[in-house]
UniProtKB/Swiss-Prot annotation:
InterPro entries: PPIase_dom_sf, PPIase_FKBP_dom, Trig_fac, Trigger_fac_C, Trigger_fac_C_sf, Trigger_fac_ribosome-bd_bac, Trigger_fac_ribosome-bd_sf, Trigger_fact/SurA_dom_sf
EC number: 5.2.1.8
Family under the similarity heading: Belongs to the FKBP-type PPIase family. Tig subfamily.
Described function: Involved in protein export. Acts as a chaperone by maintaining the newly synthesized protein in an open conformation. Functions as a peptidyl-prolyl cis-trans isomerase.
Domain of life: Bacteria
A biological-process GO annotation: protein unfolding
Domain PPIase FKBP-type intervals: 163-248
Stated name of the protein: Trigger factor
Source organism of the structure: Streptococcus thermophilus (strain ATCC BAA-250 / LMG 18311)
GN (gene name): tig
Amino acid sequence: MSVSFENTATNRGVVTFTIGQDKIQPALDQAFNKIKKNLNVPGFRKGHIPRAVFNQKFGEEALYDDALNAILPAAYEAAIAELGLDVVAQPKIDVKSIGKGQDWTLTAEVVTKPEVKLGAYKDLEVSVEVSKEVTDEEVDAKLENERKNLAELIVKDGAAEYGDTVVIDFVGSVDGVEFDGGKGENHSLELGSGQFIPGFEDQLVGAKSGDEVEVKVTFPEDYQATDLAGKAAVFVTKVNEVKAKEVPALDDELAKDLDDEVDTLDELKAKYRKELEAAKEIAFDDAVEGAALDLAVENAEIVELPAEMVENEVHRAMNEFMGNLQRQGISPEMYFQITGTTQEDLRKQYEADSDKRVKTNLVIEAVAAAEGFDATDEEIQKEINDLAAEYNMEVSQVSELLSPEMLKHDIAMKKAVEVITSSAKVK
């Protein structure tokens, strides 16, 4: 195989490669055997036309597309490997010369991985705003949140206050005309929860059971139902009941209700403190890792990041997110409906920092290469076992999905991150 590379711009070039007759002829034979099965030619049984008759009647070039499709992927990969190129996007293939009895010549416009010149990545001094210390106030706040979760709603006679729940019937109208979705009966609404559009809940504060209130609001300009966006509406609202939260007493009985492994409130507080300390330790380590990686990227020099790499990262991140949702039984349609967003909104969210993620990955890869990191068979098997447990899959399934090279790459990346973060010093 003849192979050459012409650099056309930063991280871009054209690969020219030839495919020899030793690969072409078997591919033509395979293409002929595939095509002739469905041929009906007068004078011959279906699928039994001789090769010479086929060439005379249709021409050998009728086989070229199938033959080229069969041998192109391997030929292209061999050309890239021979040149030692690290291609980061789908190539644009063009056939330059193809014909009977000659080698076929093709070109591939490729985008290559940018060069990374590492700066300092060890013993970095970083600042983080996350504290590992757990205060008494934080323990009390967690306890109070858990206590509120056990609160019961008790019907009250007085006026509704923020935090109370009102049970209401309502009918909404715009310019005196009722609209779809604007009606409800016996709907429970916690005042101050922000469940309804801005201004609605505020106008029910002070209402009592049996009151009828005309709630006047304006739909937000970005309201999901575009036919209502920006319009003024009136909701005739009847208050059926007002309920207040009644929280249990802060005592040992509460502690036992919240956690059957403790007997006293002090024991529960001690347990909550340990849980908060563990969570803060993780948050602190994550913050140090993020700060150290950011600084390592800042210290490095990356020669012009190809737009294709950023676009690939957006697609990868979105597909990973959607895959995680589907593993939880949530379809994309369901997610967008629940969140009131669109696929384009999600795309913009991932576009916002995709450039940074690509640069970070490039620097981590460069560190792994500089440190000569590899992975042993034992490390690869452990990675497979860990992934199988994380995603509730069979070990064999993970082995089929991920090649040893992919796993080696991931393990080397983890080692590189560990080198960067473990040596970092917090100011």
